[in-house]
């Protein structure tokens, strides 16, 4: 390790409710050598804060696994705020859009791979790997896509340029090494992964950060100084005595290894063509020969080709069926101890289980019909057994853990039931389905009169649409939350619910992240007695938890019979509520509804509407002040790497500037 720092948790809050007990128990389990445990934390008990305390107390490098990019981004923002002096990294798929290569034999349809990569996320991935290779105080927040193949830590750590002040090294040698590391020479604007030469100065923008550039000053063949500079102002950020520069991208293949890989690909191609000819599959033989030879020509000339990942087994010199390298190997490199946090484990683990089989099924068809060599099957995610073998100390975090996590942890379950706010799990009522709509409207009117909101969950899209339309023809203002909405569009609807523009939101899947709304005092579950995933005991407990942010929280289930799933959910909620009540009585705590700020809507056309609304009300003197405020917010969002939010602030500024100009011209 080049840099040793301790994890330092910075927060205005101290553990409260059940948090301290849970933190102590988890830390004690880790210190006693217990490899796996479950944090069974009720909704709203501050599980992320407890996990952050465990990281600070154990001082272990940590990987936090989330089941999607949105949740990963939320966790990344929270942990970055709590650990401002440590490295908190974001490691998700760098594709903004991805259509995998596929073949459908029934219709003889070949679907070519199509993708759009995100350069910013690609840089963040490389930053993650670099941090893991050089520091000990690293927290990585990743999506489940991190089980896909990555670069070998052995190869990555080999590829570097190490320089120190006073070192004797030829100018040409530095240039040669930079090119070997994948850096491209540019004479003008530097972007990540490029360098330029100006007299005795070499300026490099690393592949893993755009926050600084490295300026190397040479005096003949001697390194005179190494400065980290601001890429825009050129001001010196820090003077370094030594610096290690890592490669410009995840995968860099040197010429000698490339030559061996190409020879091995040719040998595999010969064997595959013989196989197809032997089985009288002439079309497949011609197809695999033509496609592979085209790829090889491109690799020889440019060092890559479209779909180069299908040749990674050869390019990395791995054996057939060998477990691929992943981000996990950077944590365990040099036999280091580390910590894995599986967030929402009841969703994340099933995803991990399914990814390998889905990937293999698609590629197997490509191999059988001559679109890919069999070695393409080795460019894959970890299977579930490999995933479990990679793990070190693990905490499965969930309000409703599956039997899988409980078995893996050998029943080492840490409970976190009491909320720091003293809020209780909601009261549950069961009502018959007869006249359920009339009953719902009566309940919604009661909530509306108290300035409270509601979530309504139904089983079908048709029911959701019909119910929303019906409610909107009454005195109730309703919105329909469906899965085709983008993340930011969903947050606009939730914000409008919080502001009282809507009285309720109707949806099918109310288990997703971002639905913790303190104004919601009523949750209504239609068809509670119907079988299916959305009415399982665990799903019901998650839905019930949506009413646990409000002191008046209540859940009404519409059902004609009480199913086993319903009874289990009711019993568990009752058990938790009794524990919470007892704690509150003992400590004289009065439950209070959470006060949570409502952020500005910055999605879709809302920024334009907000700008025009502001312009209609603003005086000329206020324009500049408002734009100044928005620019500050944009810069703050960019610093937190909330780039989507920053972009929306930028659009709002542009809109205000345009309106300001049009007002001036009138």
From Swiss-Prot:
User: CDD domains, per this entry?
Assistant: DEXHc_UvrB
Q: Which UniProt keywords apply?
A: ATP-binding, Cytoplasm, DNA damage, DNA excision, DNA repair, Excision nuclease, Helicase, Hydrolase, Nucleotide-binding, SOS response
The name this protein carries in UniProt is UvrABC system protein B
The record's listing under Pfam families reads: Helicase_C, ResIII, UVR, UvrB, UvrB_inter
Helicase C-terminal domain segment(s): 436-598
Can you say where in the cell this protein is located? Answer: Cytoplasm
User: What Gene3D superfamilies does UniProt report for this protein, alphabetically?
Assistant: P-loop containing nucleotide triphosphate hydrolases, UVR domain
In this chain, ATP is annotated as bound at 41-48
Give start and end of each UVR domain.
624-659
Q: Does the keyword rRNA-binding apply?
A: no
Q: What is its main location?
A: cytoplasm
This entry carries the following GO cellular component terms, namely: cytoplasm; excinuclease repair complex
Supply the InterPro entries for this chain: Helicase/UvrB_N (IPR006935), Helicase_ATP-bd (IPR014001), Helicase_C-like (IPR001650), P-loop_NTPase (IPR027417), UVR_dom (IPR001943), UVR_dom_sf (IPR036876), UvrB (IPR004807), UvrB_inter (IPR041471)
The entry's family comment says: Belongs to the UvrB family.
